[in-house]
């Protein structure tokens, strides 16, 4: 029986209560129905053909034997002197100022970045406008030159026609004078 108790103690360390109950279904019956393991008791409730049922009772911490270690209380804080409190306050103030300076620095960097982006956008817009204006002026100049060249060609053809007409008239007059 002592080996059975030690086996159950080992199982309790390794298995959950449900696993313990399940493992108890196939054990050999014992005359004593109450088992004590450290800070818990296991009572056999009833035996049936389908299996056995047990009740597991945990003892409260106050009922534990003096052998078990007592819970240690949290360590007490030592009294802090006025100088230590002042140092802590100064350190906290310094941390607050540092954090505030970091936030202000981040805001300044963000504003500077926004200014740079805006400046770049304006510069690109101005460049685009200037390029569009230059392109338009070039097209207008080219169109003007083509128009002037076309007009000059028309004038030249008109002058040639007038010269030809004058020559034809002269030739006609000469023929009339000769024939007539």
Swiss-Prot record:
Belongs to the stathmin family. Residues 76-179 form a coiled coil. This is Stathmin-3. Gene3D superfamilies: 6.10.280.30. The lineage of its organism: Eukaryota, Metazoa, Chordata, Craniata, Vertebrata. GO terms for molecular function: tubulin binding. Residues 59-82 are annotated as: Disordered. GO terms for cellular component: cytosol; Golgi apparatus; growth cone. Keywords: Cell projection, Coiled coil, Cytoplasm, Golgi apparatus, Lipoprotein, Palmitate, Phosphoprotein. It is found in: Golgi apparatus; Cell projection, Growth cone; Cell projection, Axon; Cytoplasm, Cytosol. Residues 60-74 have a biased composition (Low complexity). Exhibits microtubule-destabilizing activity, which is antagonized by STAT3. The gene is STMN3. A lipid is attached at residues 22, 24 (S-palmitoyl cysteine). It comes from the Eukaryota. Interacts with STAT3. Interacts with CLU (secreted form); this interaction may act as an important modulator during neuronal differentiation. GO terms for biological process: microtubule depolymerization; neuron projection development; regulation of microtubule polymerization or depolymerization. The modification Phosphoserine is found at residues 50, 60, 65, 68, 72-73, 81. Residues 38-180 form the SLD domain. N-terminal palmitoylation promotes specific anchoring to the cytosolic leaflet of Golgi membranes and subsequent vesicular trafficking along dendrites and axons. Neuronal Stathmins are substrates for palmitoyltransferases ZDHHC3, ZDHHC7 and ZDHHC15. The keyword Lipoprotein applies.
């Amino acid at each position: 029986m002592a080996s059975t108790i030690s086996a159950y103690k080992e199982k309790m360390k390794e298995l959950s209560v449900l696993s313990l109950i399940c493992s108890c279904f196939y054990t050999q019956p014992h005359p004593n129905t109450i088992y004590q393991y450290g800070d818990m008791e296991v009572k056999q409730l009833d035996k049936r053909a389908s299996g056995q049922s047990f009740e597991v009772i945990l003892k409260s911490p106050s009922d534990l034997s003096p052998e078990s270690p007592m819970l240690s209380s949290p360590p007490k804080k030592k009294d802090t002197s006025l100088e230590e409190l002042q140092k802590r306050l100064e350190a906290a103030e310094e941390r607050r100022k540092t954090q505030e300076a970091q936030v202000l620095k981040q805001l300044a960097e963000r504003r500077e970045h926004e200014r740079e982006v805006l400046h770049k956008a304006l510069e690109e817009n101005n460049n685009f406008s200037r390029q569009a204006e230059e392109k338009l002026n070039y097209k207008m100049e080219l169109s003007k030159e083509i128009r002037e060249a076309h007009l000059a060609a028309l004038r030249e053809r008109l002058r040639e026609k007038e010269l030809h007409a004058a020559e034809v008239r002269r030739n006609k007059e000469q023929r009339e004078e000769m024939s007539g």
